[in-house]
């Protein structure tokens, strides 16, 4: 297999280029949906979900009880001497934030009890045992955008080989759906495709010249062209993988449950190479299964979709999830960015059940290597989630789907709310320190009004809030420790506990900076700034010191100002704010520490996870990536097409599937490129004169590219 991947035979590569990178089309209509009118449903396919209502009632009642208790205690803290306007603001912010914390705690507690009692997902997707037989046709879709091709294709090939080992490989077709705009990356993708296509059939590659509607438009284009040929699709991310066993079990579950439209798995973070990524890997593996089981337990057939590592019924997806553009200008209008939540809501609106399989192993992903990379991705997600505010009143949605929208919005707006809570607390302290109080109100009174708060009760409120935040970590640790296999995977009880402490301490230092980043993102969005579609950085987290200093300067200065201000007021205020101040003041050294690449043995020793003993699919992906990387030339993409007839033949075969340019519409980059080509005497001048955007336009124009290929 490695020999085929390394070079392939000239005959196989030539045959691949001749037959083209795509199968015959099987069109499927995907009508645009309306949020103003609910569709007519022949029957509610999710009627069996009624037993879940008592679970949801229990979750909501417990959350409400905790929120009322916390709000009452905070009121008792503030009401001594009467509640001022500032104290009223603090109370309102505290109640909203405490409700968020309470819901997270109650949901995690439900997951703890569910896993402790042996609960599995409602569909019975078995984690082990004999593999079931499947007869449905599955399309594996990998949408990519300017990614590192060798790593992306290696992950897909490792997944593909894993499926072949199950004996069900004939049921799966594999599609790489490229929206790449970098011409060098485009050519590298085609070379990787040639290398892998010669090692087996049913692997296809499609490149879109114009990436309309980004990822959702990429998937929609495939559905409209090929969707009728398949029963289900599995959407992968550029950094995700799934084992063959997991995919076969998901396909079998879709066969057994014809009323299910989507099943979401829990992707486990793997292959972390920096301390920041390692913290995410440890936290996801330690706490993720319990948290996911909790939400799956009470979400039931109204679960959510996270955009990848999920199986979807094609007919349902096509009929129900054609996304319109939102009215208004960006960032709130335009194409829907966080389309996954919306697609799940539309499927459920049409009566299809949406489930989660949180205990199914074999679903993996990687994560950004540094906090800056995480924040860059988070900025796009923030804008997409805030767009959902426009959809809360969409007709026909299930109330749990609306709750998904609200929790997605809340995951970002809580950051500026925490910031406002801190600022209001500082202002109350300043008011007490510098504003002369009115001891005797207007009118007759025997007793003065002493402005004060109850410090003892305040300490208990703080302790209770911290307890709700920390308890899910402790519950997850208990689940790991009491299970022999899990305990061994984390390196034993002591190392697991040490990992929880380490993750908690470092995460506490990075949380204030993330609060500032998210608050800034909210402000930018409200000011009308669009996130765009930037290339996501993967791999190591190496960031120049100058860049770290520039990006973290504002949080660091803010922390210093807060520290000095608190110290001028009182030592107790400084101590109360110390967790936030430390995270901000130490932002630059913490960023340097967490973005540093770790030696493999050090990472495993500090924050061990079961995936440190790499599953075969992970090690195989690394082997394939190394092979593909060794075969990648650094030559200009136009020269590679000129010098490699097989690559050129494949490229032109792919252009045959490009949609025709509408009459009267001019591509400015292509027009500029053609003008320069007219002046060029040879291909070397074309290569030298054209910028990447113009080369991309030329490589998508069959006639123009043929002209260049004929130049001396």
Swiss-Prot record:
Localization: Cell inner membrane
InterPro entries found in the cross-reference section: Glucans_biosynth_gluTrFase_H, Glyco_trans_2-like, Glycosyltr_2/OpgH_subfam, Nucleotide-diphossugar_trans
Question: Where is the chain membrane-spanning?
Answer: 57-77, 89-109, 408-428, 462-482, 552-572, 573-593
Which UniProt keywords are given for this protein, alphabetically ordered? Cell inner membrane, Cell membrane, Glycosyltransferase, Membrane, Transferase, Transmembrane, Transmembrane helix
Which CDD domains does this entry report, sorted A to Z? Answer: Glucan_BSP_MdoH (cd04191)
- Report the EC code(s) recorded for this entry: 2.4.1.-
Entry's Gene Ontology BP terms: glucan biosynthetic process
Isomerase as a keyword of this entry, yes or no, is no
**How is the protein disposed in the membrane?**
Multi-pass membrane protein
Query: An example Gene Ontology cellular component term from the record?
Result: plasma membrane
* A molecular-function term among this protein's GO annotations: hexosyltransferase activity
What EC class is this? transferase
- Pathway, according to UniProt? Glycan metabolism; osmoregulated periplasmic glucan (OPG) biosynthesis
Q: What's the main place this protein lives?
A: membrane
Question: Any keyword Cell inner membrane?
Answer: yes
Q: What does this protein do?
A: Involved in the biosynthesis of osmoregulated periplasmic glucans (OPGs).
Family assignment from sequence similarity: Belongs to the glycosyltransferase 2 family. OpgH subfamily.
**Name of the protein in question:** Glucans biosynthesis glucosyltransferase H
Question: What species is given as this protein's source?
Answer: Rhodopseudomonas palustris (strain BisA53)
């Amino acid at each position: 297999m490695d020999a085929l991947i390394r070079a392939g035979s000239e005959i196989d590569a030539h045959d691949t280029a001749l037959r083209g990178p795509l199968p015959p089309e099987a069109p499927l209509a995907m009508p645009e949906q309306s949020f103003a009118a609910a569709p007519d449903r022949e029957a509610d396919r999710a009627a069996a979900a009624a037993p879940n209502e008592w679970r949801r009632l229990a979750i909501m009642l417990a959350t409400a009880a905790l929120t009322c208790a916390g709000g009452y205690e905070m009121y008792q803290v503030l009401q001594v001497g009467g509640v001022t306007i500032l104290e009223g603001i603090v109370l309102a912010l505290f109640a909203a934030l405490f409700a968020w914390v309470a819901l997270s705690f109650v949901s995690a507690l439900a997951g703890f009890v569910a896993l402790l009692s042996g609960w599995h997902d409602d569909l019975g997707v078995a984690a082990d045992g004999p593999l079931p037989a499947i007869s449905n046709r599955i399309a594996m879709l990998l949408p990519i955008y300017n990614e590192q091709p060798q790593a992306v294709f290696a992950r897909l090939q490792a997944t593909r080989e894993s499926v072949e080992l199950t004996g069900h490989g004939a049921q799966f077709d594999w599609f790489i759906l490229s929206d790449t705009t970098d011409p060098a990356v485009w050519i590298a993708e085609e070379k990787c495709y040639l290398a892998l296509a010669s090692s087996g059939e049913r692997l296809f590659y499609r490149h879109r010249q114009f990436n309309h509607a980004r990822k959702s438009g990429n998937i929609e284009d495939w559905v409209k062209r090929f969707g009728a040929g398949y029963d289900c699709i599995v959407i992968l991310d550029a950094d995700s993988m799934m084992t063959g066993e997991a995919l076969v079990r998901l396909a079998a579950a879709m066969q057994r449950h014809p009323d299910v439209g989507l099943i979401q798995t829990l992707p486990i973070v793997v292959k972390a190479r920096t301390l920041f990524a390692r913290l995410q890997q440890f936290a996801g593996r330690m706490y993720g299964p319990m948290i996911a089981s909790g939400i799956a337990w009470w979400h039931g057939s109204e679960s959510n979709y996270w955009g990848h590592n999920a199986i979807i019924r094609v007919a349902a997806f096509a009929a129900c999830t054609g996304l319109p553009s939102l009215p208004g200008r960006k960032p709130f209008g335009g194409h829907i960015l966080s389309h996954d939540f919306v697609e799940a809501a539309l499927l459920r609106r049409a009566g299809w059940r949406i489930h989660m399989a949180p205990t199914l192993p074999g679903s993996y992903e990687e994560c950004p290597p540094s906090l800056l990379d995480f924040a860059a991705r988070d900025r796009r997600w923030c804008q997409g989630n805030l767009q959902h505010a426009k959809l809360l009143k969409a007709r026909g949605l299930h109330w749990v789907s609306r709750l998904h929208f609200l929790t997605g919005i809340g995951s970002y707006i809580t950051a500026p709310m925490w910031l406002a809570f801190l600022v209001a607390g500082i202002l109350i302290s300043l008011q007490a320190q510098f504003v002369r109080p009115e001891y005797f109100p207007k009118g007759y009174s025997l007793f003065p009004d002493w402005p004060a708060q109850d410090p003892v009760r305040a300490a208990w409120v703080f302790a209770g809030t911290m307890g709700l935040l920390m308890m899910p970590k402790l519950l997850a640790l208990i689940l790991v420790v009491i299970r022999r296999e899990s305990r061994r995977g984390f390196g034993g009880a002591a190392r697991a506990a040490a990992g929880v402490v380490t993750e908690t301490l470092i995460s506490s230092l990075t949380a204030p900076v993330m609060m500032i980043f998210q608050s800034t993102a909210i402000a930018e969005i409200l000011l009308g700034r669009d996130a765009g579609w930037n290339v996501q950085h993967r791999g190591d987290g190496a960031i120049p010191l100058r860049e770290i200093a520039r990006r973290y300067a504002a949080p660091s200065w803010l922390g210093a100002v807060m520290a000095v201000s608190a110290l001028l007021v009182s030592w107790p205020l400084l101590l109360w704010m110390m967790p936030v101040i430390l995270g901000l003041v130490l932002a630059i050294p913490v960023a340097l520490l967490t973005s540093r690449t770790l030696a493999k043995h050090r990472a495993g020793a500090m924050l061990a996870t079961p995936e440190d003993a790499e599953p075969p699919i992970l090690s195989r992906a690394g082997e394939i990536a190394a092979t593909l990387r060794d075969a990648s030339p650094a030559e200009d993409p136009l020269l590679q097409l000129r010098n490699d007839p097989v690559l050129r033949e494949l490229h032109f075969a792919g252009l045959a599937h490009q949609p025709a340019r509408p009459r009267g519409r001019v591509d400015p980059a292509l027009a500029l490129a053609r003008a320069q080509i007219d002046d060029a005497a040879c291909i070397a001048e074309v290569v030298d004169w054209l910028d990447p955007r113009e080369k991309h336009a030329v490589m998508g124009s069959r006639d123009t590219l043929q002209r260049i290929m004929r130049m001396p």
